[in-house]
Amino acid sequence: MKQLLLLTSLAVCFSCSDDNNLIVQEYIPTDDASFVGKAVGNFSKEEWFPGGELGTSDDVSPSSYEAPTPATDNQGLTQNFKNGETFFERNFNISTPPFSGLGPAWVRQSCIACHPGYGHGKRQTIYRANDYGNGYLLVVYHPTAGTDALGNSYAANSYVTEVTGMPQTKAAEPFLPPIDESGIHISWPEAAEGALPFTFPDGETYSLIYPVVTIDPEAFHTSPVPTNYECRIESTIGIYGSGLLDAITEDDLREQYRAAAPYCELNPAMWDKAANDFAASAWYTLADGTKAVKRFTYALTRASLQDGAGANAIWNITNVTRSDRHKLYTTDAWARAMSETPSVIDAILADPTSPYRGDGTREGAAQAVKTLLSPTTDQTNNLFHNFAEEMKDRDYYDFMVWHRGLAVPRARNLQSEEVQRGKQLFEEMGCATCHRPSWTTGEDNYWAPENIKAQGALPKYPRQVIYPYTDMLQHRLFMLNDIRTGWCRTTPLWGRGLSLQNTGADDRLHDCRARNVIEAIMWHGYSRESDAFSTTQKFYNLPKADRDAVVAFINAI
């Protein structure tokens, strides 16, 4: 359902939320229509259209993150886009098609629950998967190398194997969730002063907060439970414009790495400094064996959008199977624990319709549970119960039309002298080194799996000049309780100034620790080791009017 007015959209989107601290800002339309598409000050006419001619929407309303690209409409894919959108917005359930197949364990019931208003998740103080806007994924990992309870060795910063990489906190009866939410604790202490004081030279002050997340050992319903673990949280980001980033060529990505390598340390997992080329681990193997360079997610774990975070999430967030995903997103440790839980077996044996009964004995039911909940079992072809595929290929295709077809909202207020001053400072201070303003897409001969190609074409964005404000590389900021590994891909800035009116929140950075743009900038300089410390120091020393101009620029692009 499209949002026409901010207050209406908030009434709809937040009706099931317990968040009483939501900041609602009245939607005030921009007064720049007569300037759009014209060169103004230090902005070219093209900069009004950050997604290029084929990827920009003129919609800057409180539903602007939801608009289709002109390419989607030009290719006659509007109806597919609309159908695909429903699979993003609707709650999946256990048994009623076409949104059936939820579980047996899941992270969220819908995509939009994590991407409120199609944007960035909101900061949370309590972890509840059912709270709208909670875009957090738990990251449970080993801070140091060691050996697990089964004798398997693991490396430092590796994910625990007892729960999934995106851990689940919900499960269908009679199963218990892999992690009990009541055992997850989030606190937000204020940071002590870092490398730069919390008072600007002109007297204005700011503060920084950061998340501390713990999970009680008894909250894990796995066998064995993890040991030597820590937890972080990572929030969802805006998904509009992803198709345009997918259209950047690998040659251009390589040139960006080569241009940056002499001036900063790059993640050795992505860049082989000695060879001056991509590292072996920078390449991702797609379903048909094609090798492609990783470019998506904070951790750079995915290469093609059609096998990227969204294509994966419609399966593993909900555990809804499809023709190319016949297995569950689970762990053997959870499957084993459920097979050993008396209440689970009791409930299964008491239900004559349960697919987990096996031969009807306790031992048979336990074996069926252990097998059917395993991540290695083909759900459609096994010894115990052959489930049907839960998402049709046509619906998955429409979902990917929608995903690749989301437009970037046009820029706003570029005629403003304050915004123009902000752009000048942004470039002079060196912000544009990592937040690279512009790329030009290639021919966009995108990769797609067979179940997509068999249905039709996806939106394409050939030869578009785009302005995402990201170098597509990972950098390190050395923040308190930093992201796992410390390496984080530069988040695109395009459209972020519309976050508050689209989502009801303006939280920034990978875990929403920054409550506004100023805090996001100052976290870049919290540590002298940060890749962005010198740039942040320059911002810190600006007079207030110039700091405000930089913020105005970031909110305009």
Which residues fall in each region the model found?
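Residue-level detector of alpha-helix boundary/anchor positions
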Residues: S9-L10, P98
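N-terminal cofactor/phosphate-binding cores enriched in small/glycine residues
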Residues: E85
